[in-house]
């Protein structure tokens, strides 16, 4: 199938082939648009531009659907662990059985330790340095320790690179946190599961099982591990978002893969991307009380007020974000099973959602809750500090970045990314 482009100035007609998709709309192949017509396409923000063909994840914004390699996100969250999803994203296959799942997870556990020299680098940062700045730097430094990943040729090379960074990113994030608060570094405990280890390194005390709560001392519960596991799965990948596209763009230059991942971390830092869940919680704090919700909703509608309601709306989803639905259910489940929630903030969030889902202003603009709206409330209940919400996002998303990077570098169509511009200067 082809599409005809007509130049109305001279009535010249140009034929462009279309590219079929297995899900979603077709694409018109404009790769030779300039060569054929003398024109560039102009698409600020690339909202109508496909920069690649991918088999990793698919988002149906109208229907509110998300798939990882053909599997519905609802099924993956319900039936599989995060490490199984990691294997799916990196290899295209879920574990066939428990033994295969454990084998993959044990590899991640054993690769989770980091070179001691990194500790000196982290200690050199000011104590108030943002953890995302430190984490991005730490991943970049990893490229100096594993220089062989600069030249990958076999599938084993690719998988080693990806699994190494997926294994180490929780350790780096935990070091960033404990360095900031002045607590001793806790090394990975390979006897713990991959996900439990993350909570242990963030929350635990040295040389002992976790003892942290405001009401008596209890260890990490299986319920907490399960909840955190689901959060990581929900954040593992999301098609060509800003950070994933950044990873692909930087990787296209031939740079060390960990430098590309570092760039992805920097992109995720922004409050319009990964930093949004932190902003949601801070905004709920600002609202302060259920009785103030109407006032803030009115501010959203006021054309003279720049106030924006965080956690609502999405560039792709024009319906309820499926990840937000899962997180809302998870929040309710945790509350019912006795996990302590911030009742005040939960009530404010529920009231905001109740009003927004019925208000014509939000409905007309397709402003529905997104993944950030409830994730912060749950992370706080899991005793994750607010400043470390975005690093948690990094932990979950690193495997998706690796999958995107590998898909790009292994593609015979891969080229250095070089967008055009419409010059309007003197």
From Swiss-Prot:
UniProt keyword Transferase present: yes
EC id: 2.3.3.16
Active site: 314, 372
GO molecular function: citrate (Si)-synthase activity
Pathway field: Carbohydrate metabolism; tricarboxylic acid cycle; isocitrate from oxaloacetate: step 1/2
Gene3D superfamilies, A to Z: 2.20.28.60, Citrate Synthase, domain 1, Cytochrome P450-Terp, domain 2
Keyword field: Transferase, Tricarboxylic acid cycle
Keyword Transferase appears in the UniProt entry: yes
GO (cellular component) term, any one: cytoplasm
Listed InterPro entries: Citrate_synth-like_lrg_a-sub, Citrate_synth-like_sm_a-sub, Citrate_synthase, Citrate_synthase_AS, Citrate_synthase_bac-typ, Citrate_synthase_sf, Citrate_synthase_typ-I
Miscellaneous remark of the record: Citrate synthase is found in nearly all cells capable of oxidative metabolism.
Protein name per the record: Citrate synthase
Organism: Helicobacter pylori (strain ATCC 700392 / 26695)
């Amino acid at each position: 199938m082809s599409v005809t482009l007509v130049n109305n100035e001279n009535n010249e007609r140009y034929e462009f082939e279309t590219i079929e998709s297995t899900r979603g709309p077709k694409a018109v192949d404009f790769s030779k648009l300039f060569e054929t017509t003398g024109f560039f396409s102009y698409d600020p923000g690339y909202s109508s531009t496909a920069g690649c063909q991918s088999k990793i994840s698919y988002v149906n914004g109208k229907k509110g659907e998300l798939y990882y390699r053909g599997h519905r996100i609802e099924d993956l969250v319900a039936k599989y662990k995060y490490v199984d999803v990691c294997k799916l994203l990196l290899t295209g296959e879920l574990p066939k059985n428990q033994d295969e799942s454990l084998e993959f997870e044990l590899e991640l556990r054993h690769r989770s330790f980091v070179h001691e020299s990194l500790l000196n680098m982290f200690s050199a940062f000011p104590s108030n340095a943002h953890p995302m700045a430190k984490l991005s730097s730490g991943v970049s430094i990893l490229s100096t320790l594993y220089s062989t990943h600069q030249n990958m040729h076999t599938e084993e090379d690719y998988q080693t690179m990806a699994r190494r960074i997926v294994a180490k990113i929780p350790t780096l994030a935990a070091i960033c946190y404990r360095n900031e608060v002045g607590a001793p570094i806790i090394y990975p405990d390979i006897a713990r599961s991959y996900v439990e280890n993350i909570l242990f390194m963030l929350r635990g005390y040295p040389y002992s099982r976790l003892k942290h709560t405001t009401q008596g001392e209890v260890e990490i519960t299986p319920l907490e591990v399960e909840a955190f596991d689901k959060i990581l799965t929900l954040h593992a990948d999301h098609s060509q978002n800003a950070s994933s596209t950044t990873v692909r763009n930087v990787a296209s230059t031939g740079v060390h893969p960990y430098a590309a991942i570092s760039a992805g971390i920097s992109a995720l830092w922004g409050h319009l991307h990964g930093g949004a869940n932190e902003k949601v919680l801070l905004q709920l704090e600002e609202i302060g009380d259920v009785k103030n919700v109407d006032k803030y909703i009115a501010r959203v509608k006021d054309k003279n007020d720049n106030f924006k309601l965080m956690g609502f709306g999405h560039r792709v989803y024009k319906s309820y974000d499926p990840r937000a639905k899962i997180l809302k259910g998870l929040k309710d489940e945790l509350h019912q099973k006795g996990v302590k929630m911030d009742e005040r903030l939960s009530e404010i969030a529920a009231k905001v959602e109740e009003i927004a889902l019925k208000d014509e202003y939000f409905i007309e603009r397709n402003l529905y809750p997104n993944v950030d709206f409830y994730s912060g409330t749950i992370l706080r209940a899991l005793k994750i500090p607010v400043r470390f919400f975005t690093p948690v996002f990094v932990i979950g998303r690193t495997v998706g970045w690796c999958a995107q990077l590998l898909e790009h570098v292994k593609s015979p169509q891969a080229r250095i990314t070089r967008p055009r511009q419409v010059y309007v200067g003197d």
